[in-house]
């Protein structure tokens, strides 16, 4: 009895399993046949409309180089300073800026300035340190991602965004469960479509049935109406076939190929029936193909985070682009010669435009080429052939660069309406006091950074705006500084006058002594024979490298408050008689760096041991032969010196004859450089 019951139960189980598989197979076949009918009907009645546009490349989020951002979002700074990192020394080619400024990409950033060197990266200048932060993006588990406008991180392009796998509170479902959910959703959609088709068929049948009021109408009346409605469609179809017979043949071939593919898929499905004792991984979800008919960017161009870059792309004209979402356009190092009025009509929201290293001429720029760029803030036209500043520049400009051109004149109207301009760079042109109008800079109410280096000025340009804070006039022919040179520039903080022809007796006593904000002056490579007198009392940095200076007059720094901190006198002709104990009077308490290398000193200058704040001392490449006791360390004092770097190499010192306590106040002997020495 038990055996017969068990046998019947097994037969019933086998029958149920076979019936379930057959039911599933028939359901899948019906679904595919239905989708095939829908696809054929859509191919026969609808044709895709191609729309022009721009094919975007996949956005690549650049990784910030500095600083290092840990997993807990803490920041590790890489702050290069010889005052805090052993072995790093000052550079002669760096002009110290205002205390708290930062140097980034060749530009001096103000304290608390914020900028974005790369997409998704934000940097902050804080008390001389550059702090950068990068937006971290979680990976998306979807076939295609997009970056929404104004965002850094990609999101899924479909409506259902999958959860990231790295979230701890949610566990990713197995792939077969995802496939089952997709199949269930597809079945529900299929049932809804079938219901709609049935409803449409019922409506058509109701229309064809005669109502009681229709018996008196002729039957051919409805036929004639249908014929009239179908006649234009038939005529249009015949005309289309007559014009494009080849295209019709291609479409028929495509439909036949699709039918063959569907049949092959049906055969494969029949062979790959899922059995109860086997497991088969579900196929990959289809990835949508790129729409056909969308034109791509010009060759050698790229699109990344609202920026179009065409660097060294062999362009001879500005490409016609229509993309209102683009905010930055780079056309660097091409062969563009002209800018027509309508060049940027398709880019109305441009904020940054870089046209450097081209062959653009002033005559090739339309009078309204830039007028309608209402959001433009940064314009770079370095390395072109401009002889005048372009007209009708937008009033929103904050930065204008026209370096390395052929500018020959700046009149009163050249910079009109640029009242928001902060940075102006006009280096490497043919400008002088004869072709620059004294009222040219008057409209620039917000200008704080002005570069006029590598021109032909013989005096300081007149009419500088009162808002100016940094002025650079390197590589000109300036010979004197008069009392009225900086009369109206009370906010000026940095003056760079390297490589000119200035002599100390051509600097007027009242030229800058009353400036209250002037902290940095660079007079390197001029014709100075001693340290200039009447320096600003607010001075902090003084750079006098590469002159003919033979002495430092006494009390020359005595009037300064709070006091000089950085003094660079390298590559001069200083001798022992040119420095005495009162030469550094007024700077003993404040001097942090003193560079006296590459001179003709035979001994360590007096007063070094009294410089309590000194961190960096260079005396290398002189003619020093011995180090006397108490020239660097005072034996009567027990406190350690703040000196962290002492350079005495390339002199004539006999290291074995140095007194044992000569460097006793220095905390680490590794900070003293004594070798190599000259032998003579």
Curated annotation (Swiss-Prot):
UniProt superkingdom: Eukaryota
LRR repeats (start-end): 349-369, 375-396, 397-417, 420-440, 446-466, 467-488, 491-511, 517-538, 539-559, 563-583, 590-611, 613-634, 642-665
Residue stretches making up the LRRNT domain: 288-325
Glycan attachment residues as annotated in the record: 359, 430, 487
InterPro entries: ECM2, Leu-rich_rpt, Leu-rich_rpt_typical-subtyp, LRR_dom_sf, VWF_dom
Compartments reported by the entry: Secreted, Extracellular space, Extracellular matrix
Family that this chain belongs to: Belongs to the small leucine-rich proteoglycan (SLRP) family. SLRP class I subfamily.
Subunit structure: Interacts with numerous extracellular matrix proteins. Interacts with MSL1 and RASSF1.
Role noted for this protein: Promotes matrix assembly and cell adhesiveness.
Name this protein carries in UniProt: Extracellular matrix protein 2
């Amino acid at each position: 009895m038990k055996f017969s019951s068990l046998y019947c139960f097994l037969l019933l189980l086998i029958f149920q399993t076979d019936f379930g598989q057959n039911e599933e197979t028939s359901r899948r076949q019906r679904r595919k046949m239905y989708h095939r009918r829908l696809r054929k009907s859509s191919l026969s009645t609808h044709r895709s409309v191609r729309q022009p546009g721009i094919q975007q490349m996949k956005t690549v989020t650049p990784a910030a180089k500095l600083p290092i951002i840990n997993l807990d979002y803490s920041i590790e700074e890489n702050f290069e300073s010889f005052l805090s990192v052993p072995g790093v020394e000052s550079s002669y080619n760096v002009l110290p800026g205002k205390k708290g400024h930062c140097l980034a990409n060749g530009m001096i950033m103000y304290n608390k300035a914020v900028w974005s060197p790369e997409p998704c990266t934000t940097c902050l200048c804080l008390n001389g340190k550059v702090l950068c932060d990068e937006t971290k993006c979680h990976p998306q588990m979807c076939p295609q991602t997009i970056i929404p406008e104004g965002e850094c991180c990609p999101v899924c392009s479909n409506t259902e965004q999958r959860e990231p796998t790295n979230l701890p509170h949610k566990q990713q479902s197995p792939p077969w469960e995802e496939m089952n959910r997709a199949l269930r959703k597809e079945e529900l959609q299929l049932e809804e479509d079938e219901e709609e088709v049935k409803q449409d068929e019922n409506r058509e049948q109701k229309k064809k049935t005669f109502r009681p009021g229709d018996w008196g109408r002729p039957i051919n009346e409805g036929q004639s109406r249908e014929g009239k409605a179908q006649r234009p469609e038939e005529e249009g179809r015949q005309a289309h076939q007559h014009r494009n017979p080849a295209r019709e043949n291609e479409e028929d071939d495509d439909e036949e190929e699709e039918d063959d593919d569907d049949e092959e898929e049906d055969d494969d499905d029949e062979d790959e029936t899922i059995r109860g004792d086997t497991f088969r991984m579900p196929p990959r979800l289809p990835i949508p193909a790129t729409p056909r008919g969308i034109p791509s960017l010009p060759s050698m161009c790229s699109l990344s985070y609202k920026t179009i870059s065409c660097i060294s792309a062999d362009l001879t004209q500005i490409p016609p682009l229509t993309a209102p979402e683009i905010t930055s356009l780079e056309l660097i190092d091409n062969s563009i010669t002209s800018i027509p009025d309508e060049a940027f009509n398709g880019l109305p929201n441009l904020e940054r435009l870089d046209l450097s290293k081209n062959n653009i001429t002033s005559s090739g720029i339309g009078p309204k080429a830039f007028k309608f760029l209402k959001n433009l803030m940064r314009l770079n036209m370095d390395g072109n052939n401009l002889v005048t500043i372009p007209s009708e520049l937008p009033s929103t400009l904050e930065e204008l660069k026209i370096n390395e051109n052929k500018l020959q004149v700046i009149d009163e109207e050249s910079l009109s309406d640029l009242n928001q301009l902060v940075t102006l760079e006009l280096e490497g042109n043919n400008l002088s006091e004869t072709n620059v109008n004294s009222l040219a800079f008057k409209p620039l109410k917000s200008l704080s950074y002005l570069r006029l280096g590598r021109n032909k000025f013989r005096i300081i340009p007149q009419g500088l705006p009162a808002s100016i804070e940094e002025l650079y006039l390197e590589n000109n022919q300036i010979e004197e500084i008069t009392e009225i040179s900086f009369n109206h520039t009370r906010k000026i903080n940095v003056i760079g006058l390297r490589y000119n022809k200035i002599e100390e007796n051509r600097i007027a006593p009242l030229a800058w002594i009353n400036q209250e904000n002037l902290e940095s002056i660079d007079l390197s490579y001029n014709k100075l024979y001693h340290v200039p007198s009447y320096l600003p009392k607010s001075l902090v940095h003084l750079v006098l490298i590469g002159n003919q200076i033979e002495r430092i007059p006494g009390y020359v720094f005595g009037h300064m408050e709070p006091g000089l901190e950085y003094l660079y006198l390298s590559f001069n002709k200083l001798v022992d008689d040119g420095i005495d104990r009162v030469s550094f009077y007024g700077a003993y308490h404040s001097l942090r760096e003193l560079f006296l290398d590459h001179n003709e000193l035979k001994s360590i200058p007096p007063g070094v041991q009294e410089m309590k704040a000194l961190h960096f001392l260079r005396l290398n490449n002189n003619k020093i032969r011995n180090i006397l006791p108490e020239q660097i360390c005072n034996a009567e004092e027990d406190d350690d010196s703040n000196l962290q770097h002492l350079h005495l190499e390339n002199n004539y010192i006999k290291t074995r004859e140095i007194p044992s306590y000569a460097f006793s106040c220095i905390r680490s002997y590794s900070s003293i450089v004594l070798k190599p020495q000259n032998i003579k």
